């Protein structure tokens, strides 16, 4: 097994999730992905806040497509097994699965980081294609093209170095690496990429412009696959028998997707069911210091907005059509608040509101 190419890591991760007490079947997203294979719309980037199941879905996608594993025993029991394209695509492809949240032990520079990724992928390619001499090629993409095969890419936490504010002087280099690896390459059958914030947040011009982006506020195609729907939470409550849905709804109250589907944060729901107790389970999802400076200096009257919400009132959320490449506080005050405190509504409009529990 390779580290990135045709790894069994995703299947092992998904098996663990599948065996958990409160498993929710999100496999029907695969039916929609199957329709994109080998087409112009094969590049998609799905972004969500932390703890909304992005990595779990990525593991599922890789475990389904990879021909290096046999995942039929699991997927035969899931909803995807009932669709026409199920058998046709199950365990049929070379899969390159990279999570960008790993740092090398040998050093903490950008060169250490990117070379770890490149060398690991090259090593995997040589293992599967022993007749290829990597020294004859200039880029990883050239090596992949020389195989004559096609690949499905599953890329998780693509924006890790941006969200962690690492290697500022090399962030454009990283965008170039992804662009040269993926854009207009005949060996790419499908590229499924996830992150916290959209590509437009960091990129302008032609970098990664081949991707269709699906953000929390604008995703009308995949919204129900990230987070738990009301029906899914009701079913989990029935399985639990001790926790009633009304209590979970009072505490967590859900989020409304772009097409009106109510979504609950998986971590909060699962932890409440495991402990038979509702409280805030949003630990380690984001640093408070990302918000504190805006409150301290009342940037764009954000502090006033928070006071208004604590009083039980709602504030409108400004949804920008595009993200700015270089983030500037003066242009995105409401967006910072939406990300920091979250948005929650029973209507089809987006507001920020704090409710006392």
What are these regions (language model features)?
Residues 1-319:
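Phosphate-binding site recognition
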Residues 324-357:
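Domain-level recognition of nuclease-like catalytic cores that cleave nucleotide substrates
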């Amino acid at each position: 097994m390779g580290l990135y190419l045709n790894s069994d890591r995703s299947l092992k991760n998904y098996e663990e999730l599948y065996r958990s007490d409160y498993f929710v079947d999100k496999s029907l997203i695969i039916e929609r992905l199957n329709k994109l294979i080998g087409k112009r719309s094969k590049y998609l980037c799905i972004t969500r806040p932390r703890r909304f199941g992005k990595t779990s879905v990525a593991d599922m996608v890789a475990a389904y497509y990879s021909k290096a594993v046999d995942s039929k025993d699991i997927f035969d029991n899931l909803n995807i097994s009932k669709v026409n394209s199920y058998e046709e695509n199950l365990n049929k492809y070379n899969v390159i699965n990279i999570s960008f949240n790993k740092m090398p032990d040998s050093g903490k520079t950008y060169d250490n980081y990117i070379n770890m990724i490149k060398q690991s992928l090259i090593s995997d390619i040589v293992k599967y294609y022993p007749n290829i001499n990597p020294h004859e090629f200039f880029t990883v993409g050239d090596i992949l093209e020389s195989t004559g095969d096609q690949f499905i890419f599953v890329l998780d936490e693509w924006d890790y170095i941006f969200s962690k504010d690492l290697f500022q002087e090399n962030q454009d280099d990283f965008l170039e690496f992804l662009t040269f690896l993926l854009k207009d390459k005949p060996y790419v059958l499908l590229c499924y990429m996830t992150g916290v914030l959209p590509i437009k947040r960091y990129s302008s011009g032609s970098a990664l412009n081949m991707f269709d982006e699906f953000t929390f506020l604008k995703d009308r195609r995949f919204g129900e696959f990230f987070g738990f729907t009301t029906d899914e939470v009701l079913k989990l409550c029935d399985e639990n028998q001790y926790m009633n849905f009304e209590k979970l709804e009072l505490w967590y109250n859900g989020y409304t997707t772009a097409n009106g589907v109510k979504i609950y944060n998986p971590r909060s729901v699962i932890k409440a069911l495991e402990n038979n107790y509702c409280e805030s389970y949003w630990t380690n999802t984001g640093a408070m210091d990302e918000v504190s400076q805006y409150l301290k200096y009342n940037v764009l009257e954000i502090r006033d907005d928070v006071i208004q919400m604590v009083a039980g009132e709602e504030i409108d959320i400004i949804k920008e059509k595009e993200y700015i490449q270089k983030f500037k506080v003066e242009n995105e005050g409401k967006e910072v608040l939406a990300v920091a405190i979250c948005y929650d509504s029973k209507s089809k409009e987006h507001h920020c509101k704090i409710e006392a529990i």
